[in-house]
């Protein structure tokens, strides 16, 4: 019974680590992924080793499977809280909606406005790049000012140039100055 409990706990630790490592790889953060992978591998070997010691012990197998499933739930929750990386939203509007553009820019979001031809009239599209950790804030602003906007989103693997890159460089310089001043 203690072995089954240990296996369950190890799976609840292992699977979220596996989830985070996978996300780091997808986000092209290979060094961080490799570091996390060390811990992941150690836990995996210990847990699976206990299960393989006695394959007739069904409690250990059930603990492994249920722990894996619970670990997936926990891993998804942790990933959403960490919100690693960046996201792009494409927002389609019937009018230019300068109020929305101004509010997004005032809130520190990079916004590019495009004018396009819809079936019956001119349409406007906003491309907005944001840290995933600010996605909720972004959606609140859009929903408050343009609740009927059509939105689609996708995650960014990498990017170069633009407003967001300049803003990040500025923040890094300010942190350096603050660090040297103290």
Curated annotation (Swiss-Prot):
Belongs to the UPF0316 family. The keyword Membrane applies. GO terms for cellular component: plasma membrane. Keywords: Cell membrane, Membrane, Transmembrane, Transmembrane helix. Pfam families: DUF2179, DUF5698. The keyword Endoplasmic reticulum does not apply. It is found in: Cell membrane. This is UPF0316 protein BCQ_3166. NCBIfam families: PRK04164.1-4, PRK04164.1-5. The chain crosses the membrane at residues 6-26, 32-52, 58-78. Coiled coil: none annotated. InterPro entries: DUF2179, DUF5698, UPF0316. Its main location: membrane. It is a multi-pass membrane protein. Signal peptide: none annotated.
């Amino acid at each position: 019974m203690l072995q089954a409990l240990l296996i369950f706990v190890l799976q609840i630790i292992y699977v979220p680590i596996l989830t985070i490592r996978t996300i780091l790889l997808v986000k092209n953060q290979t060094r961080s992924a490799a570091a996390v992978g060390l811990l992941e591998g150690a836990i995996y070997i210990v847990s699976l080793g206990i299960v393989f010691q006695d394959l007739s012990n069904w409690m250990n197998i059930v603990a492994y499977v249920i722990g894996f499933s619970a670990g997936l739930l926990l891993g998804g929750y942790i990933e959403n809280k960490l919100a690693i990386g960046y996201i792009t939203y494409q927002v389609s509007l019937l009018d230019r909606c300068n109020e929305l553009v101004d509010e997004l820019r005032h809130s520190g979001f990079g916004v590019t406005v495009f004018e396009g031809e819809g079936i019956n009239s001119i349409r406007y599209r906003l491309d907005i790049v944001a840290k995933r950790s600010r996605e909720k804030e972004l959606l609140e602003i859009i929903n408050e000012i343009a609740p009927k906007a059509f939105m689609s989103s996708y995650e960014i693997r990498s990017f170069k140039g633009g407003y967001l890159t300049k803003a990040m460089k500025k923040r890094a310089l300010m942190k350096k100055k603050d660090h040297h001043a103290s």
